[in-house]
From Swiss-Prot:
Its main location: secreted. This is Placenta growth factor. CDD domains: PDGF. Disulfide bonds join C52-C94, C83-C128, C87-C130. It comes from Bos taurus. It is found in: Secreted. Keywords: Angiogenesis, Developmental protein, Differentiation, Disulfide bond, Glycoprotein, Growth factor, Mitogen, Secreted, Signal. Antiparallel homodimer; disulfide-linked. Also found as heterodimer with VEGFA/VEGF. One of its GO terms (biological process) is positive regulation of mast cell chemotaxis. InterPro entries: Cystine-knot_cytokine, PD_growth_factor_CS, PDGF/VEGF_dom, PDGF/VEGF_growth_factor. Residues 1-18 form the signal peptide. The keyword Calcium does not apply. GO terms for cellular component: extracellular space; membrane.
Amino acid sequence: MPTVRLFTCFLQLLTGLVLPAVPTTQWALSPGNISSEVEVVPFQQVWSRSYCRPVERLVDIVSEYPSEMEHLFSPSCVSLMRCTGCCSDESMHCVPLETANVTMQLMKYRSLDQPFFVEMSFSQHVRCECKPLWEKMKQTRCGDTISQR
């Protein structure tokens, strides 16, 4: 087990050296930005940023590949585009209209085994739309998915 911890620390250190530093963002009322005026975000911008659309999300690899629970991956999550956001009315929800597969190279290993590179495919959401919630409920009954024909 100490070997795995050492290897994980090594990967984190290596990642920190390779990736550029991300600048921190200041909030409107942070101590470094004291002002009596508060910027108001216009409605159109608020609407466009909150409406149903694909947004970058960090997704755990094991949640996409539950059969791989006995393995460790580096990184343990990947960045994918996923549908999220609000719809024009409460009876609707945001769902993918179009998806595409993306293949990523990851490092895979078991506790004492030598790590190796693998290529894994993930589904990304390309286009999203708002659909009625009743369509979602119609497809599931008592937690079991009904197959679509």
